[in-house]
Every structure is written in structure tokens, then in C-alpha cells.
């Protein structure tokens, strides 16, 4: 899987990042979700996981000709935190080629979500 960097929301010690892939999907890199209340409410398949990212990370979708405001909070966004961050559910990235293109700190992981699913979240693009 080849990745195209779209953008990140960087603060010291934090690096949520958004990538487009060569297979009509996005890779969302974010914080590992550890909140037991959130984990208790979301059912995951064995190949899925969750990441938490700032909502403003999604502005970088415009760099892949997908713009608009996220107004439809539906999968792959499965929860919004009290801080306004998105909890994103997707396929856990295990592809060695993709992982080799990213710098992922120990407190983060990444998921793949389909482009059509992300496009369905937007209005006004």
C-alpha cells in the first residue's frame, strides 16, 4: 500500500496524521483508545481497532479533492469525545510497506477506512 501524506495535527508529543492510499481509502493515524467506557460501547471485529484524532484533522481531506464539513457522525466515526475529538473505527494496518512509510509513536496506531465511507460523512464539499 502506497501512502500520500495529506496532513497532520501536530503538537509536542502528538502526531495524528491523515494519508490517502493507492486503493481508494485513507489511513488515519491517531492515539490508541484506552477509555474503558468507549471500548465497552463499540464492538470491533478481530481485524479492526480504534484511533482518536482531533476533528480538525479532517480539513486535510481537501488535499485529496474531498472537502466539506463533517456533519454525518456515522461509521467510520463511531464516537465524539467530550473534547470534540473523533473516535474512528477501521481496519488495523498490518501492511509492512505502509507501516514503513509512517512514524508511529508507541501511544498511537493507525486504521484504514474507505474513501466512500469518509465522503459520506461530509456536506458542503
PLM regions with names:
Residues 1-22, 26:
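Short, charged/polar N-terminal "headpieces" of proteins
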Residues 7-8, 29-30, 89-90:
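Pocket-edge structural micro-motifs
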Residues 11, 20-22, 78-84, 105:
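Short, ordered beta-strand-loop transition motifs
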Residues 25-76, 96-120:
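Acidic, aromatic-enriched beta-alpha/helix-loop junctions
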Residues 70-94:
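Charged/polar low-complexity intrinsically disordered segments, enriched in acidic residues
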Amino acid at each position: 500500500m502506497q501512502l500520500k501524506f495529506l496532513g497532520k495535527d501536530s503538537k509536542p508529543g502528538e502526531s495524528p496524521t491523515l494519508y490517502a492510499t493507492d486503493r481508494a481509502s485513507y489511513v488515519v493515524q491517531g492515539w490508541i483508545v484506552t477509555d474503558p467506557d468507549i471500548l465497552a460501547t463499540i464492538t470491533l471485529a478481530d481485524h479492526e481497532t480504534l484511533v482518536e484524532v482531533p476533528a480538525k484533522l479532517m480539513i486535510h481531506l481537501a488535499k485529496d479533492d474531498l472537502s466539506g464539513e463533517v456533519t454525518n457522525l456515522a461509521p467510520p466515526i463511531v464516537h465524539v469525545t467530550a473534547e470534540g475529538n473523533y473516535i474512528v473505527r477501521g481496519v488495523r494496518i498490518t501492511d509492512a510497506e505502509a507501516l514503513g512509510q509512517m512514524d508511529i509513536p508507541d501511544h498511537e496506531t493507525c486504521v484504514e477506512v474507505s474513501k466512500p465511507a469518509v465522503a459520506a460523512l461530509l456536506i458542503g464539499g
